[in-house]
Amino acid sequence: IEPRQYWVVVGSNGSGKSAFALALQNELPLQEGVYRNTFKNVQSFSFEKQREILEATLKNLNNDDTDPDFFGQTARETILNGGSELTFCEQIAEKLGITYLLDRFFIKLSTGETRKVLLAQALLQKPDLLILDEPFEGLDQQSVQDWMAMLNELKKESLKKVLAWVMLWAVVAVG
């Protein structure tokens, strides 16, 4: 994978797409051969990451010390993830069309809105490789079309930078 490339990895469930993503992030031990990775900042987002964040939020909310009117972090706080790049956060939110979500509680967002917030969080880290693992899982057909349009716009813009993309996409066999 070279800078400014856009890859789509397609395969059935269990075919190794997520393992490939882990290998790209140096999170999977090499069994044999040689692996050379020139990417310095690899970011990924997936349905699993979304689920983990929501579970952690619910766990934090389900205790006696929590105010019942508190719903965790806002979308802005989730994007910033402890960082302080507020201006860049708002620029990314504008590019993704989610500025109206920034002050809403993350836990109250729809699946598609949550995904966009997590994409913004990944982009805030200024990755040189971005891995989107099953970005359309759980989205309706219109949301998938909206996402494809948004990703195509981001892809055009990223060609000016050194960002490379890998999208993992499951194919369901019919018949």
Enumerate the predicted regions with their spans:
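Helix N-cap at the start of a conserved alpha-helix in ABC-type nucleotide-binding domains
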Residues: 141-143
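Catalytic Walker B motif of ABC-type/P-loop ATPase nucleotide-binding domains
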Residues: 130-134
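Conserved catalytic loops of ABC-family nucleotide-binding domains
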Residues: 150-167
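Conserved ABC ATPase "signature" region
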Residues: 84-101
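ABC ATPase nucleotide-binding domain signature region
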Residues: 18-83
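Conserved ABC ATPase signature
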Residues: 105-109
